[in-house]
């Protein structure tokens, strides 16, 4: 009874405090890490989406006849293939290489030698890749971080993207291919790529080496991958926004659906797995839309064949403090097995409980047709693994500009 009362009061407070507002941020942080890349990449996609809504026609034949039914979808498909596909692949691939693998190597004290970008099929059949120089002191778990970093950074990017899409409850087609690439970078790569040098295969071999046995078989990881691919409803909405709503119907965006629990409360579950330096964690994400608020609760745990680990995470977006000031809150607590890594040639060991909390303050200057303002993120993380953050403990400080430009055509 007491728990229900506390929950009711809590939900009432966050409901009263204003209206949801998706926003895009151009931020800076000292280490130029994965959150820096994720926020700024989403801002780039928003700018491209806004320019597309103003400048690109959805049809070249205005009359409603058989020619329009055939020609207009061909025009839209050609535009998608020759611009969206190539631009999206470049942004997401370079994010994977530079701010994924590259960031984790720089964090370990190594250096980036070169990054080679190869265009996607059918233009080439070669993978893009990064060459790096390893530091003298480098643990196997830092090797695991380097291997998982590419897919990890695209999880960070699509977490930001998903948050904005759910706040608006609309999926603009210009984000569709990016979401499919980023959110499925880890499960898709794991399920379908068989090259022995591929990151998931190297990761699995490193985990088995770490524990001196074979707790991770390829068939098990493929099973987790297919579950993740087919239990994310956002994959369906991304495909629909691109191939049905845009190409066939000529729409700029489409409404997404959530499970209606009441007149005020909606719900969207999804499953994914995350690679960590101690093995994959299975993650159960739950998004709640309460009136105009978005809340996320997640729980994750290790595979049964690996050392025990668990994590509880909560995010709340858009707590309105005044007409101009809003607040986002993020926190997580975990229990992790042993992690060893070098920093500045000093061996650091972490095991057991850890926490991370971040508060984001948004100050809006203008809220007419377009939104402009400032954002500041401040928080703390203890030593241990959290997606997108450094391994070592320390303060988290990020800041920059926020904006949202109104689309001309929807």
Language-model regions: role of each:
Residues 21-91, 109, 114-119:
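Auxiliary, metal-adjacent structural segments of Zn-dependent hydrolase domains
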Residues 82-137:
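Small-residue-rich helix-interface/hinge motifs
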Residues 166-176, 244-267, 289-295, 319-327, ...:
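Short loop/turn motifs that connect adjacent beta-strands in outer-membrane beta-barrel proteins
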Residues 280-288, 314, 359, 391-410:
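Outer-membrane beta-barrel "beta-signal"
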